[in-house]
Amino acid sequence: MKEFFATCPKGLENLLAVELTNLGAEQVRETVAGVHFKGELAIGYKACLWSRFASRIVLVLSEFQMNDDLDLYLGAHTIPWEEHFSGTSTIAVDFTGTNPAIRNTQYGALKIKDAIVDRFTKRGHVRPDVDKKSPDIRIMAHLGKGKANITLDLSGPALHQRFYRQGTGEAPLKENLAAAMIARSGWAGEPMMDPMCGSGTLLVEAAFIAADMAPALRRERFGFDRWLQHDSELWQSLLMEAQVRAKRGMQRCEVKLFGCDADSRVLLKARDNAKAAGVAHLITFKQADVTALENPLPMPAPVEGEEGQGEARQVGMLISNPPYGERLGEFPALLEVHQALGDALRRSFQGWKVSILSASPELLSCLRLRADKQYRLFNGALECQLRNYQIAQDSVASQKEVAQDFANRLRKNLKTLEKWAQKENLDCYRLYDADLPEYNAAIDRYQDYLVVQEYAAPKDIPAQKTRQRLLDMVQAAIKVTGMDGEKVILKVRERQEGKQQYQKLSEEQHRMEVQEYGARLWVNLYDYLDTGLFLDHRQTRRMLGQMAKGKRFLNLFAYTGSATVHAGLGGASETTTVDMSRTYLNWAQDNMRLNSLVGREHKFVQADCLKWLSEADDQYDLIFIDPPTFSNSKRMDESFDVQRDHLLLMQHLKRLLAAGGTLVFSNNKRHFKMDLAGLEAIGLKAQNITGKTRPKDFERNQHIHNCWIITHAEAQA
């Protein structure tokens, strides 16, 4: 008997072991991501031809202890390679694993290649050439636990490739994982539907199973084609047997398979795939969104003369691998999809079995179904759950509202604030700000977009519970506001005392224009933790605009310059905008251009504001400064703490503040205490105006900011 090894994705080992046993393999033994087995050559061939779960079938040539590269070379050199291939064949060596002597896989592969070539050369044979892309013979070696294992690949291209794909949608499901999903679902040939079928992999795989078609039947090339020990006669007999079984199976196959997808382009590829696989007549494809999902099986006709509906409606299996998103920002739309799928299942698929694969337990929870069984599978490196459900015959679409307390509060806020915002002619405002402690997030509306920013939860609350509450909030917010899930942006932030540092989330550019009391402003809802507009200072900016006519205006820690825009529109004679970030300074210039505020009278300075303040000597009639609570940026020479350093800040600002001028000072430190005595000592006076600058949508947060008007003492005398 020969010794073989079958590789597979993690989670498929048991399925593969049972499959190989049914094919006649002996001494079957599971290991991580693979199965050891023994048998005659025919068993190896059958595994290559019939395995629906394996990735590769390899013939074990040698296993030996290995401490260093010499052991590897000598172990490979002793294998009678000339019995497996000739010098005219091309070879490739794939190597995995490392140890202190073999520190990279390329070196390990090179040592084995050298051993092979040297053996051929020393015996007077032509030495084989290397072809890494498409070799006649592929040698595979693995180093682990002090042992080297050298094998000969019998598969050729990976066995999950069925050679019918004409094109795929994004992130296509591998065929052996699709086969595993079908096996674990318990499907027994009843009607099957995939409501998000993509390129049709699950449905084509189901058709192969129903028609008794060997998964490798369409393959033209195997790894053993140029192997010297290949038994062509034996292989042809096994191949003919599989062809006969497929022909007979296809003739008697009456399986009903249905596939839906919202993307018409992907459906075209799915149809092409089914046609290329020879199973197009078994699959009905339809363009449909999951929110409008309907049962594909007809209702039975009522029996004439009898009450009721006659015979029961046929039931089936719904199986799918819906998108599950790898980035948090993708979740809102996916929540909507999963919630819609769960509603559709309860509404129209009573009595059906359901099997869903996902890497996100939170998304699966949005189905609002109780799983009967659960399996752990891997989609590549991504750990997933396959959950099986049984839809009750009397099931109805759920009327229960998700996160009901939160939904009620949001509905109340929306009713009040929507009317106020329309009256004020505002298209961006805060809808919710952690009003309920257990739903710890801020929700801002920007026209027809929602930005949901989760505050970091206390460490004693389990992460899974926090995550589930966040997703419940998003679901409820979508339902209450009627927003499209695609237009809900989800972010996670620490609860900050102020604008510590502006954090970038991605390299993309998503800008949109909003309006605020006549000012046109660019915001970016996606790429940064903050959007470019601090909504809590809306009234402050309006006030600055009203105060600015004929004034020389200075904006420090200017961010995106929205306050400068208001001052410019209010008639400021000149403006100076200072910020350390070139990105935000460019953004400020774009905001000014958007409002036709261009010219030499509008200056933009990239500088450390504290350093710039200590050196500047111009005079300004109106100054706005909104510094961070704390900053220790690499580009700043020293750290800054607004409580500790605000008096020093005022000393510099006093020098720049013209006689009769006004300084508007704000910060976000909770419980900030102004040093009034210190101010008086340097000749300044302050008035707290926070009550006037906190807008209606922030009334619930008394500590969102504090704001002061500061003037020269003699001006208030």
Swiss-Prot record:
Keywords: Cytoplasm, Methyltransferase, RNA-binding, rRNA processing, S-adenosyl-L-methionine, Transferase. The gene is rlmL. Signal peptide: none annotated. GO terms for molecular function: 23S rRNA (guanine(2445)-N(2))-methyltransferase activity; RNA binding; rRNA (guanine-N7-)-methyltransferase activity. PROSITE patterns: THUMP (PS51165). Its main location: cytoplasm. Its EC number is 2.1.1.173, 2.1.1.264. It catalyses: guanosine(2445) in 23S rRNA + S-adenosyl-L-methionine = N(2)-methylguanosine(2445) in 23S rRNA + S-adenosyl-L-homocysteine + H(+); guanosine(2069) in 23S rRNA + S-adenosyl-L-methionine = N(2)-methylguanosine(2069) in 23S rRNA + S-adenosyl-L-homocysteine + H(+). It holds the Pfam family UPF0020. It is found in: Cytoplasm. Specifically methylates the guanine in position 2445 (m2G2445) and the guanine in position 2069 (m7G2069) of 23S rRNA. Belongs to the methyltransferase superfamily. RlmKL family. Residues 43-154 form the THUMP domain. InterPro entries: 23SrRNA_methyltr_KL, DNA_methylase_N6_adenine_CS, RlmKL-like_Mtase, RlmL_1st, SAM-dep_methyl-trfase, SAM-dependent_MTases_sf, THUMP_dom. It comes from the Bacteria. This is Ribosomal RNA large subunit methyltransferase K/L. One of its GO terms (cellular component) is cytoplasm. It is an enzyme of class 2 (transferase). Disulfide bonds: none annotated.
